[in-house]
Amino acid sequence: MFQGVYTAIITPFKNDKIDYDSYNKLLEKQIKAGVNGVVPCGTTGESPTLSHTEHAELIRETVKAVQGKIQVVAGTGSNSTREAIELTEAACKDSVDGILSVNPYYNKPTQEGLFQHFQAVAEHSSVPVMLYNIPGRTSINLQPETVFRLSEIKRIRSMKEATGDLGQMGKLISLVGNKMTVLSGDDNLTLPLLAIGGVGVVSVVSNLFPKAMVEMVKYFQDGRVIEARKIHYDFIEAFALAFMETNPIPIKAAMSWFGHCEPEIRLPLTRLSQNETSVKFKKALEVLKEKGYE
């Protein structure tokens, strides 16, 4: 089962192609920081605008680059169950450690439809499955009772919870017990979720500050709550501003500001608006760097 810090890694582009030179350096940064794993081809990795060829290649290159030093949990979700199965089978052949499967979006299935979708995906996976509940993106909420049913399926072992609803997360954890691990899908709720039984985060901010996110989670797990709380408070403004526009627009801009990639992003997403809020975001990140956070 997955626990700890998993970075929802960006996909750097250069001249509208994946920039593997920059990408491999980002992976090295993550490994050095001690994250538990990376999640390529997710929301933050701009998966909706990757071609099937790019999607498969990016997963393959990620596995090759990390050399087993950290886990690779590949995003293989789709609103077509058939396509999700195809992407999952391809990722499994490339020796990933797990798959991240998002709620089917746009077609708005019922809870029974969600159950059958994830059941079908799990049946075609040779690795553990992390469910991904993000109703703000998909317009459908995977209810705790449905997740409890899914927890009976052997391959379904974890969940990335991005509802922003701690009440729902608490109910979920109380239902699934030790059958599944629950990780935060929102950086600003990582510490609160840990306090009610969560075990980690699939983080956006860890693209830029992986070591800090690893330290915060580890401090909490070691009972050093005051130290964990300090990191959380220091990052509160950055956590909020990292979502001032649609993810991954702000984090892509931030990574380019600090020389990690080009600012290029694929339509229909556009580059970060230049205004007082973006200036505030850059300043907040610079302050964190000045404090020694990495």
UniProtKB/Swiss-Prot annotation:
Its EC number is 4.3.3.7. Pyruvate binds at T44, V202. It holds the Pfam family DHDPS. One of its GO terms (biological process) is diaminopimelate biosynthetic process. Gene3D superfamilies: Aldolase class I (3.20.20.70). One of its GO terms (molecular function) is 4-hydroxy-tetrahydrodipicolinate synthase activity. Keywords: Amino-acid biosynthesis, Cytoplasm, Diaminopimelate biosynthesis, Lyase, Lysine biosynthesis, Schiff base. It catalyses: L-aspartate 4-semialdehyde + pyruvate = (2S,4S)-4-hydroxy-2,3,4,5-tetrahydrodipicolinate + H2O + H(+). GO terms for cellular component: cytosol. Signal peptide: none annotated. The record marks T43, Y106 as: Part of a proton relay during catalysis. Its main location: cytoplasm. The active site is at Y132 (proton donor/acceptor), K160 (schiff-base intermediate with substrate). Pathway: Amino-acid biosynthesis; L-lysine biosynthesis via DAP pathway; (S)-tetrahydrodipicolinate from L-aspartate: step 3/4. SMART domains: DHDPS. It is found in: Cytoplasm. Catalyzes the condensation of (S)-aspartate-beta-semialdehyde [(S)-ASA] and pyruvate to 4-hydroxy-tetrahydrodipicolinate (HTPA). Belongs to the DapA family. HAMAP family: DapA. Homotetramer; dimer of dimers. This is 4-hydroxy-tetrahydrodipicolinate synthase. It comes from Leptospira borgpetersenii serovar Hardjo-bovis (strain L550).
